[in-house]
């Protein structure tokens, strides 16, 4: 139906234009650019002219090709395995020989050198992130220390980052930081820290942020809250219904067969603030970062930002891909 396709294109073009006016959407696009780079955006995003040129014939052909490629069928529901198998045999028609998929997992960009990527957004508040590729592939044995570090340092309103940057120093509207876990066995850990602050507080906020990231404040009271909160959540969390399927696939992607929370729950019981400090020194301290800043560039102190690394300005078209 060409009329429906034309309306779909118009809706998508408008949605894309609206996204460029939204600060959070702009920051999300910048973050993706910082993590994965321009090649990933070009491979996964149609430009507006390419979108406009898309025809019903092309789309239907692409959908038809899917049934000739290797795939899995997930089912959660009341039917028995026999009933589901019979329904698939009747309705799920595939090619006799399925083409294998070229499985290339999305990789974080390296952060061998510090640099600053800036994107323009007209506002009195800026969004700031610093990102590091930690260079290590998944290791399930690291789950307890990483999980407890994230809970203590950057996990929520009681975390060290939030309390220091917003409550104690008044330098950010919000703040968070965490070690990012791989989704596949061959992908690497990353580190991402984020603050939203006023343009005129940028330098003070970044310097304070860097100080607490590299020289983590130690509070037994905050640690107790974090540890108890984590244990309580693990004790009550349940994997139910269709979550069981996604949990199985997530574990399989990491080469695991046993639920990760079991080990975390058992190991965290005996962990101390010293263990969190050791994790911070092992995973976080003195890393090189790529910095991403979304804000009104003419209102920011570029001389200060140059001390973080060479600056490059990226356009909306670059970060969104259209």
What spans do the regions from the language model cover?
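A general structural signal for short secondary-structure junctions and capping/turn motifs
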Residues: 64-66, 108, 119-122, 165, ...
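Short, structured coil/loop segments at alpha-helix boundaries
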Residues: 22, 139-140, 146-147, 165-168, ...
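Charge-rich, well-structured scaffold segments of protease-associated domains
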Residues: 1-100, 174-322
């Amino acid at each position: 139906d060409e009329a429906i396709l034309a309306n779909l294109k118009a809706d998508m073009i408008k949605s894309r234009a609206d996204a460029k006016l939204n600060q959070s959407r702009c920051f999300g696009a910048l973050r993706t650019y910082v993590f994965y780079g321009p090649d990933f955006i070009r491979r996964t995003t149609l430009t507006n002219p390419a979108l406009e040129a898309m025809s019903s014939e092309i789309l239907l052909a692409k959908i038809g090709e899917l049934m000739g490629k290797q795939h899995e069928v997930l089912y959660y529901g009341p039917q028995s395995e026999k009933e589901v198998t019979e329904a698939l045999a009747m309705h799920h028609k595939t090619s006799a020989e399925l083409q294998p998929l070229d499985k290339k997992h999305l990789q974080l960009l390296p952060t061998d050198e510090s640099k600053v990527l800036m994107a323009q957004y007209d506002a009195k508040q800026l969004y700031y992130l610093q990102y590091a590729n930690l260079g290590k592939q998944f290791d399930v044995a690291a789950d307890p220390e990483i999980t407890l570090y994230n809970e203590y340092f950057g996990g929520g309103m009681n975390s060290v980052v939030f309390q220091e940057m917003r409550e104690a120093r008044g330098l950010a509207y919000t703040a968070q930081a965490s070690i990012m876990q791989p989704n596949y066995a061959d992908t690497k850990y990353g580190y991402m820290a984020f603050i939203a602050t006023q343009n005129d507080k940028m330098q003070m906020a970044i310097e304070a942020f860097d100080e607490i990231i590299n020289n983590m404040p130690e509070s037994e009271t905050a640690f107790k809250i974090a540890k108890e909160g984590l244990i309580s959540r693990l004790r009550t969390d349940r994997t139910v219904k269709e979550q069981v399927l996604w949990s199985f696939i997530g574990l399989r992607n990491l080469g695991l067969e046993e639920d990760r929370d079991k080990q975390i729950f058992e190991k965290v019981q005996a962990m101390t603030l010293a263990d969190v400090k050791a994790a911070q020194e092992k995973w976080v301290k003195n890393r090189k970062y790529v910095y991403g800043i979304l804000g009104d560039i003419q209102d920011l102190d570029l001389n200060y930002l140059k001390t973080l690394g060479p600056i490059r300005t990226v356009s909306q078209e670059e970060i969104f891909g259209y």
